[in-house]
Amino acid sequence: MGKLDIIEKKGTERLKRGFAKMVKGGVIMDVTNAEQARIAEEAGAVAVMALHRVPADIRKAGGVARMAPIEKIQEIMDAVTIPVMAKVRIGHVAEARILEALGVDMIDESEVLTPSDPYFHIDKREFKIPFVCGNRNLGEAVRRIWEGAAMMRTKGEAGTGNIIEAVRHVRLLKDNIALLQRMTDEQIYGVAEKFAEPYLRLAFEVREISGLPKQVLENEPVYGHYTYREIVEGLYKILLEIKKLGRLPVVNFAAGGVATPADAALMMQMGMDGVFVGSGIFKSSNPPKMARAIVEAVNHWDEPDVLVEISKEIGEPMRGQDIEELEVRLEERGV
């Protein structure tokens, strides 16, 4: 079976979300080479994320962060039997098409890389491969799900080893869902209209440049071939589903700042479906032990006595950064 045949089998929304459910309850680790990928697999990771650099090094290097080199991704794909994911820049359709043709298992449209489109994220429904996207709140999550994301994650603040932003994003999302469940359908439609406003940014900017009022026609496309009203209706449908379920309709992982087994357990205690670990493994003093400990912490998140043993003799975690001292906030990228 060729790679394109495999992609074809991933195509429907049901299959895309089904693939995401396969990694539920697990840990996905960032890796930059075959050796790291094998360490992750041996530690029990359910998947790996192939990058050129881990987020801490991306932050340190500065400049423009792009999709990892194809040779690097292929090296990682050849090294492990677990699923391999890879990141593309926000809005970069060409990078996504390349990864789809390469045959990775999932694409992360990621704020960790330098965004390529200041207005829009990729319309993920145009692809057969599943996507995961980050969110800071319910609005961002609903927009990404409407665009076709099969899996969500918190943005956190990648590369810092500081869990505070991931906690913030989980709390904002959960409390907004709780509020949604107390709202009438009419009120929820108003929320959908509010959440759809970012799709108007380009149209409004063009009108401002042209000296025209910031208004769009009822039948005017504002995102691909979708009108503002069509977007509102789509978001409204997802919001009603969230109200009914009491959670997002897709798998939702924690990401951004997970650096210790305790961090991973905290995210699971807060109701997340699993954990992404970026720099926290390979910026620690003993990556194999830290990797295994974080996997075990996710498996035993509600067993404090077990967590005590898991947290022993695992070496030093990565050096963390105070969020208030950051010059660049990766979480603010995207809309």
UniProtKB/Swiss-Prot annotation:
Q: Which reaction does it catalyse?
A: aldehydo-D-ribose 5-phosphate + D-glyceraldehyde 3-phosphate + L-glutamine = pyridoxal 5'-phosphate + L-glutamate + phosphate + 3 H2O + H(+)
List the GO molecular function terms. pyridoxal 5'-phosphate synthase (glutamine hydrolysing) activity
Which residues participate in D-ribose 5-phosphate binding? 30, 159, 257, 278-279
Sequence positions that bind D-glyceraldehyde 3-phosphate: 171
Q: Entry's Gene3D superfamilies?
A: Aldolase class I
Q: Which domain of life is it from?
A: Archaea
Q: Which residues form the active site?
A: 87 (schiff-base intermediate with d-ribose 5-phosphate)
Pathway the protein contributes to: Cofactor biosynthesis; pyridoxal 5'-phosphate biosynthesis
- Which EC class is this protein assigned? lyase
Q: What is its EC number?
A: 4.3.3.6
Q: Which Pfam families match?
A: SOR_SNZ, ThiG
Which keywords are on file for this protein? Lyase, Pyridoxal phosphate, Schiff base
Q: What does this protein do?
A: Catalyzes the formation of pyridoxal 5'-phosphate from ribose 5-phosphate (RBP), glyceraldehyde 3-phosphate (G3P) and ammonia. The ammonia is provided by the PdxT subunit. Can also use ribulose 5-phosphate and dihydroxyacetone phosphate as substrates, resulting from enzyme-catalyzed isomerization of RBP and G3P, respectively.
Q: Which PANTHER family match?
A: PYRIDOXAL 5'-PHOSPHATE SYNTHASE SUBUNIT SNZ1-RELATED
**Which family does the similarity line name?**
Belongs to the PdxS/SNZ family.
What does the subunit section of this Swiss-Prot or TrEMBL entry state? In the presence of PdxT, forms a dodecamer of heterodimers.
The protein here is known as Pyridoxal 5'-phosphate synthase subunit PdxS
Species name: Thermococcus gammatolerans (strain DSM 15229 / JCM 11827 / EJ3)
User: Which lineage is the organism of this entry classified under, starting from the top rank?
Assistant: Archaea, Methanobacteriati, Methanobacteriota, Thermococci, Thermococcales
